[in-house]
Amino acid sequence: MAVDKFNIMRESNFKYSVAIRTVGKAGDKYIQELQSLHNQTVKPEHIYVHLAHGFERPKEQVGMEEYIDTPKGLVHQRAAANMVEEEYVLIIDDDVYFPEDAVEKMYNALQKYNADGIAPDTFPSQSMSFFSKAGAYLTNTVKGRKNDEWAIRIQRSGAFSFNSNPEKGAIYPTESAAGTAVFMKTKVWKAIHYEHEVWIDKYPAGTFGEDQLMYQKIIENGFKLLMWYDSGVLHLDANTNKASQKSYDKIYYRAMSQYLTWYRCIYDLPRNTSADKLKNQLAYVYRFLLSCSVRLVYSILQFSPRFLTAHIKGNIDARKFVKSEEYISLPHFVLSPKE
């Protein structure tokens, strides 16, 4: 499924708008993003900037942006893309650079492969060092796969596996992606009702895998997602949404995220049989025990059990939460036509 840029016909008869989430602190990287959007071969109809409530409008402006005061939270600000009325929407963070023909090429890829959304590969896991890959597996069972013409696959444990050797410039189907940027059909975006997941925003920004949940909601509701390798789209990484909590709190909330994402996106799906659920549980137990062993070693080295206990307590509290009235009352992850 490798893409040849010379074999994709130019199609420019489409309209889209951009939805950016920001707290207004990306600085020069935000300017680079805006300028790259203004330089697109197909211009956006609107550039909506969903600025978190209480934060000042960035001094850096290009001129076409429309600022929308939005409740603070990664999900609240992303779900605000619902206001887009054009046929397509480009949903992005505030620190992404796009080559001038990037949006046009993403549109053309959707037509060629009959897909609903496409995300550029802005976090190339396949390029990690050996030690980084080993660490990713030990802490989170993230692992590489041979080139099977898929990009990201989600394992039963909730962790992802990545294509270790994608073809240069390839476009492959995927089950997840970095949340940095995605171009998709607006009707599909609205169909998944991402606003139903605003419960995530009660957790500190940067501790919850809300992007994985977003993409899996697209997949589990029957839509097709692509990943584009070597696109030239760059995550400039302004570091504005990293977790502020350190040590204990950070580990605790990430452990909660790990369990809740697994439960909502993997375990508690209507298509699962009893056998599927058992396999999912066993996979998660393996992931949990492996990550506990790593945190045990770290706790020993730091002469403190807190790093291990934070991970365990996060999982325990997450398990309690999915049995609570608050969680049970959430709308279904896989939506019925009436929802």
Give the predicted meaning of each segment.
Residues 20-39:
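Short, well-formed alpha-helical segments that are part of the catalytic scaffolds
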Residues 34-69:
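Acidic donor-binding segment of Leloir-type glycosyltransferases
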Residues 74, 150-184, 206-207:
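A recurrent flexible, glycine/aromatic-enriched loop bordering the glycosyltransferase active site
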Residues 89:
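Short aromatic/hydrophobic "clamp" motif used to bind/position activated sugar donors
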